[in-house]
């Protein structure tokens, strides 16, 4: 039953972004585990390199949904947790941003980790405005305090939002064209300035691939 429900959900997500669900291989395991692969092609890609000082940093959605969902699971509020885990793939927004973005990636390893990865690839730094970072309302409801809320929002990961850098002169156009609201959270600075939030260094913590 769990597998059938998963396949139904996977097919629905694929249909929403005009992709085709192909199938996969099955094996036995002590718990229900899914490993997915997406295959596609683009005319011109936007990678992690290319951000330049003066570009604006924009993100989609709100951060901390998955962190909040896990806490709701721990409280056995399963319906709320499952709702929070329902993400909309940002395919259309990615296509829109591709027309202007100088660098882009997703936030699945955490916003902080993504910013550091972009900074390393682009040989730049970032000056982020903490108050501008959009945080999920659900996280505010379960966080212990302001610092716990911030930690979960930027370091937990699994939010699957886009993080991109855009020339300042193109920002308004991208906001108007994007099917998903874009939030400006900071700007690109010189490499020697590092990655900071309100002038303080932002730790490079998030999901680490083994």
Which residues fall in each region the model found?
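Residue-level signal for inorganic ion chemistry
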Residues: 21, 54, 106, 164, ...
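Active-site glycine-rich loop that binds ribose-phosphate moieties when present
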Residues: 37-47, 78-96
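Short, conserved charged micro-motifs
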Residues: 45-46, 169-176
């Amino acid at each position: 039953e769990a597998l059938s429900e998963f396949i139904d959900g996977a097919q629905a997500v694929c249909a929403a972004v005009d992709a085709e669900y192909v199938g996969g291989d099955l094996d036995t395991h002590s718990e229900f585990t899914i490993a997915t692969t997406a295959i596609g092609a683009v005319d011109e890609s936007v990678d992690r390199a290319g951000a330049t000082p003066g570009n604006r940093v924009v993100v989609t959605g709100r951060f901390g949904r998955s962190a909040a969902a896990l806490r709701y699971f721990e409280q056995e509020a399963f319906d709320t947790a499952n709702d929070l885990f329902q993400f909309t793939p940002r395919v259309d927004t990615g296509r829109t941003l591709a027309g202007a973005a100088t660098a882009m990636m997703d936030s699945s390893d955490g916003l902080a980790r993504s910013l550091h990865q972009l900074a390393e690839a682009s040989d730049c730094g970032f000056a982020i405005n903490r108050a501008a970072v959009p945080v999920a309302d659900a996280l505010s409801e379960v966080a212990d305090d302001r610092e716990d809320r911030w930690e979960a929002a930027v370091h937990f990961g699994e939010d699957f939002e886009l993080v991109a850098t855009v020339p300042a002169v193109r920002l308004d156009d991208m906001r108007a064209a994007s099917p998903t609201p874009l939030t400006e959270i900071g700007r690109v600075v010189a490499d020697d300035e590092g990655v900071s939030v309100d002038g303080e260094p932002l730790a490079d913590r998030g999901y680490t691939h083994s």
